[in-house]
Amino acid sequence: MNDLLLENLFGEKALCAQVTRDQLLEIIAAGARSKFPKSLLSMYRVTPRVMTRYPLKLITNESITGVVITTVYNLKKNLNIPQNNKLTTQDIERYYLDKSVEVINLMVGNTSLGDLACGRPRRTKSSKKKDPVIFLGISAPLILVMNSKKSINTYIQDKKSDPSSDYVNINPGIGVLENYGNTYLLDIHNPSSVLTISTIYGLDNNMELKKLSTASEIDAYQDVNIGKSVDLKKFNEIFNTMKKHLSLSNFSI
């Protein structure tokens, strides 16, 4: 049981805490109370935004592909599924694509976890400090590939314009490429209406993507683990491979 507790990756400390007072107030006003599912991004204290003070500028109308990354343990925990029970595809869809979910963050081609962690250069005294651990060796990571059911409008906040005095809700069924930390995530609003989980992957012991196509493959994957921890540097390598292999959407800004 103690080993299982170690897999709760989304602990009390954020990997990047450089938030100004104004940014904190904006986060609270724009989405801190919204209903959204947890993922790997929770360890970075990412709170999706459901409101904005800026006009939205259209950047594209096309089908999109992004990923959500989590672990078997954390999905079971968030769904209140006993650890000795099996997680199903239906459970995953229920958690991420329920009609009550207001917004979901997708990692796309514009995303870099190194930048999300502030990308601060290390000082000489801390040069031997290890990178933060993204996955523990006892983890069973899940990479959920999400595709839009059709072409959707994707916007970016036009921060060259003067902000309005009031926050306004962002319309459902659209994507907004949002800046978090020093990188970008694609926020999909009311994802149940526009997204589908097209493919589920795990990671094998060689840190390569392992496609989980059937219910039996998903069941069997939950009985194993990756065997060794994955730090931020290694995860960035894995994620860069994902970008190419999974053809994640990449937006010109």
Curated annotation (Swiss-Prot):
Keywords: Late protein, Virion
UniProt keyword Translocase, yes or no: no
Post-translational modification comment from the UniProt entry: Undergoes morphogenesis-associated proteolysis which cleaves the 28 kDa to a 25-kDa product. Proteolytic cleavage of major core proteins P4a (A10L), P4b (A3L), and VP8 (L4R), which occurs at a late stage of core formation, is required for production of infectious mature virions (MV).
Site residues by UniProt (Cleavage): 31-32
One Gene Ontology cellular component: viral capsid
Subcellular location: Virion
Induction trigger: Expressed in the late phase of the viral replicative cycle.
Residue numbers covered by the propeptide annotation in the UniProt entry: 1-31
Single GO term (MF): structural molecule activity
This protein's record includes keyword Repressor: no
Top-rank taxon, per record: Viruses
Family: Belongs to the chordopoxvirinae VP8 family.
Entry function: Major core structural protein.
Protein name: Core protein VP8
Record lineage: Viruses, Varidnaviria, Bamfordvirae, Nucleocytoviricota, Pokkesviricetes
